[in-house]
């Protein structure tokens, strides 16, 4: 990795990040092998509370695999993942369920239920948690629609929504329980530039309004530059670069330049 030294592997509770408060996420020496293929080759990464981190890299380079590890949807071959001071590796499903309450996920597709209205989709996590009061559900959904700038859309079905609207509904559903952290899997994928820009603004607004920590997996460099406090470049299963957008743009490293300019030169993830 360039521009910043790698984080050391640890076996105790993660330390706080100087000047940025406590650590929301800390990944230590994370490895994942599927068959004979090494997907993750020793990831060391830390995300401060309230920070927005963008993870960039070539398609098939392990970005989404890393994201799934952060919520326990995949188990690593080796390494540790700490969420707010708790090592989630080896946790039971019940324990992981408690961790997942702290984390919202926006999947690339939005993952809406086709048979449910917008209101029902957004309220789904609350119903799953046992909330049954119609007034409470309507009030919380209305708040989310206001945040998403989708007032009056609660009775629509997903099939009638544009791609950008589906993303907003998916995001509203993922944050309705006020998680500490939101994970975004390619949030602007398949959107035109204007709609993508509106999603980027929304990600920043959520950080500012609710203080949410965000991890944004993307291959959209404009999105990464727009939303991120810090950018991590995943290359060949490792964090090759970890720094600010300015540091990334000013880097003369040939591997980074190839990625930014879209050149392959026989290299890739």
What are these model-derived regions, one by one?
Residues 116-124:
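Short coil-to-helix segment of the ABC ATPase nucleotide-binding domain corresponding to the Q-loop/switch region
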């Amino acid at each position: 990795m360039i521009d910043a030294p790698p984080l050391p592997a640890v076996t105790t509770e993660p330390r706080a990040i100087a000047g940025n408060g406590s650590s929301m996420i800390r990944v230590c020496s994370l490895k994942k092998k599927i068959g004979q293929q090494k997907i993750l080759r020793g990831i060391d990464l830390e995300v401060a509370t309230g920070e927005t981190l963008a993870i960039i890299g070539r398609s098939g380079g392990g970005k989404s695999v890393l994201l799934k590890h952060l919520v326990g949807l995949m188990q690593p071959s080796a390494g540790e993942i700490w969420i707010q001071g708790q090592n989630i590796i080896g946790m039971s499903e019940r324990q992981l369920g408690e961790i997942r309450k702290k984390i919202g996920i926006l999947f690339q597709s939005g993952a809406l239920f086709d048979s449910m209205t917008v209101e029902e989709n957004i309220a789904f996590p609350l119903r799953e948690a046992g909330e049954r009061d119609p007034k409470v559900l309507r009030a919380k959904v209305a708040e989310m629609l206001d945040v998403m700038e989708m007032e009056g859309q609660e009775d629509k079905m997903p099939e009638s929504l544009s791609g950008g609207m589906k993303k907003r509904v998916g995001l509203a559903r993922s944050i309705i329980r006020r998680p500490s952290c939101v994970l975004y899997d390619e949030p602007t994928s398949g959107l035109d530039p204007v709609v993508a820009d509106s999603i980027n603004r929304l990600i920043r607004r959520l950080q500012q309004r609710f203080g949410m920590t965000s991890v944004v997996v993307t291959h959209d460099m404009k999105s990464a530059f727009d939303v991120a406090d810090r950018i991590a470049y995943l290359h060949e299963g490792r964090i090759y670069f970890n720094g600010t957008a300015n540091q990334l743009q000013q880097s003369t490293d040939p591997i980074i330049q190839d990625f930014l300019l879209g050149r392959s030169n026989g290299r890739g993830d």
